[in-house]
Structures are given as C-alpha cells and as structure tokens.
Amino acid sequence: MKPEISVVMAVYNGETYIREQLDSILAQLSDTDELILSYNKSKDRTEEILREYERAFKQVRVVECLEKGVQANFENAVRNARGDYIFLSDQDDIWLPEKIEKCKRCFHETGAELIMHNAYIADEAPGSIRDISVFQGRITKKGIVRKMLKSSYHGCCMAFRKSLKEKILPIPRGPFFHDVWIGMTAEIFKR
C-alpha cells in the first residue's frame, strides 16, 4: 500500500539527539506511512541506531547517500519518498505530537502545494522549550529576490505535496540550501 505520509531526514553524526526525534515522528505515523533516513557515513554510532530502528519499525527505510553534503543527502531522501505529502525533518528536532495531523488538515483546507509552520527553540536541557516561537511575528512576504536575500524557508518547518517533488529535483549544489530551493520553486510554480 502506498504511503500517505513520507517523512524524510538527512542524517550525519546524529547519535546524540536522533533517537528522541525518531520516536517523536514514529508516534505520529500510521502503519502505511514511511520515514526515509538518508545517511552519509558518520563517524559516530548513527548508522547503527538507524539500522536498529529499521529492524524495529516497518515504516523506517534507511538509504545511504554516496554523495557527501546536506543538499545531496536531502535530495536522496526526497527521491526515495513515495507518499502524497512529504515532510522534511532535521535529525536534532523533536516534533510536537499533532504536527502531522495539523499539517494534513492545512493541506486539505487550503489546497496549498507547500506549507510552513511555526517552530520553537530548545537547548540541550530537558524540557527547555521556549514559550515564544522563533518565527512569531515574522511575516513571509512575496518575492523571489526577497526570499533569496533573507530566507523565510526552514526545512524543519516545511511539508509539501508529491506534485512538487518532480519540480524540485534535482536539488542544485550551490549557495542555497535545499529548503530555500524547495520554497522558491514552490513560489515560482504556485497555482
């Protein structure tokens, strides 16, 4: 059965935080959804942890990215995604419990091809989430040049429809990260 949700993550040297993030995502996935973990060869125990999760959860697929770098690693993850909705994830985040459900509702209500949501910043201390959002009060304004100069796109806060996938691939290697590329591409091709 084809997944409705694909969560994609680029992973490198992430053993310190990755378990907590994987658990926060897996708690929200159905049995038919998928979590794509694309990794570059790490110097720590990251690959071992990924393989452990792959054995324990049928939603998890681990794919190696032979090209080094975050852009190539995210591209590899997105290429392997099969879901109708693709969520980007960083390896050191923790997802709030209703993130996927709220984003799905937003897709259905708006018909948007790409959505962005708020985020909170936390430090290494347990329970250290600030009560003020990092993006609160920042309005995303129209205009490609403005987006290029001051990015309003943050991959950890981004989800998009499968229909955008063919437009964003391949992700160019260059001055912009994958999330800026995806956001600008969505803006160019918006309905």
Describe the residue ranges of each PLM region.
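Conserved nucleotide-sugar donor-binding catalytic segment
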Residues: G143-R191
